[in-house]
Amino acid sequence: MILTFARSLYTQGQYNGKIREYFYYVSHNGFLFLDDSRMKNFTAAYKDIQFLNFFYRKIKENKTGRYEDTFPWVSLCGIERNFLRCDDTPLVYTELDSTEKELRIGQSTIYHSFQPSSLSMNSSGRVYHKCPIGGKALVADKLTDKLYRRFRFDDDGVPVGFQCGEQIIELKK
């Protein structure tokens, strides 16, 4: 219902004065789609690395006065506004590099520093990591599955630590 409502608010590529506007969606798996695409699966996701890198580097909170409730994020590109809504967070970490020092954003080649102590898990089991945009980024399910065995839990099932090599890193509450 919300998607149908959002679609009726805009037309892809519409002009607002001299500013062209596009509308995007980020899934919980870190894939970027045109918001109004019917099929939101791997084949429909953006794969152009240069575009993804540019798009993700420019994301900020939407304070444009347009679509702020429906599209809380925006990626500005010259005279274009790329409005963004997301399943959870605007950035999603999809991969931990082989050195375990950096997390990859979506399908881009942008990495942020991995800080195990900043991991957190909500009551539904979703895992988050500190992020400069929005304060935290979702860790994609596929990566969470790989990391899950390294979490340490208290008697109530709350994650309290994360194993890095021989060391257990205490998680912040």
Swiss-Prot record:
Pfam families documented for this protein: DUF4505
Coiled-coil portions: none
InterPro entries per UniProt: DUF4505 (IPR028108)
Record-linked PANTHER family: UPF0598 PROTEIN C8ORF82
Family in the record: Belongs to the UPF0598 family.
UniProt name for this protein: UPF0598 protein F59C6.12
Species of origin: Caenorhabditis elegans
Classification lineage: Eukaryota, Metazoa, Ecdysozoa, Nematoda, Chromadorea
